[in-house]
């Protein structure tokens, strides 16, 4: 037993650790959406969840974070204070669980007060930041029992939103098209980017690899900030196969076919 008057000695180790900012997971479906917003130079009123990390470089698109549900009400407030033209390069971003928690009432207020603006619901089918709990739109209770699932697109339409667009978060061309079209409208628009959290699917995925002989060192694949991507000393890029989830975002950005799937026999 160890008593109060006893002393103990231990060796102290001094480690030199690389400074690292908090970032989205490899393969996170939010990363492609934020890449598009960054590319289009659109600001985002943020909310509480994994997607808050969109404030961190190199994505750097989330400019406000107050509390759960405040992304939509912040966008609403900007529109009323500064006018609809001011928010043409702004969107609100909010997760599916947070939208059902306190975002839906903010969207109701936008409709009630005849606001304009674009809301992006980042629907990853879970409550990712706090441990992957189910919520009212997943179809399961917290005990894992089947239950009624709230239909988020139908809920938005029931509130009165006429412009409800659903896209695959992995399809960055579709995301970009939807964002460009909806922010141009003088009405409330809701874009729902629907792709499950990468941590929910434990199945084996195809991996990607780079061909340094084809790499032009342009850095396009590095812009989304995937932690599996590393720039080598010579400017080419390598992919860490222990971190790659096979999402394919990097390959979709490479114009030189320098990133391709690893063949099954080459793993």
Q: What label would you give each PLM region?
A:
Residues 20-41:
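Active-site pocket-lining segments that scaffold enzyme catalytic pockets across diverse folds
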Residues 181-232:
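Glycine/aspartate-rich loop-and-adjacent alpha/beta segment that forms the canonical ThDP
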Residues 1:
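Glycine-rich, acidic loop regions that bind phosphate or pyrophosphate groups
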Residues 55-192, 202-206:
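Thiamine diphosphate
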Residues 216-238, 245, 249-266:
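Iron-sulfur cluster-binding cysteine motifs and their immediate structural context
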Residues 8-21:
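Short, small-residue-biased leader/transition segments that mark boundaries at the very start
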Residues 41-56:
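Acidic-glycine-rich active-site phosphate/pyrophosphate-binding loop
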Residues 49, 122-125, 169, 195-196, ...:
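Short, ordered loop/turn segments at secondary-structure junctions
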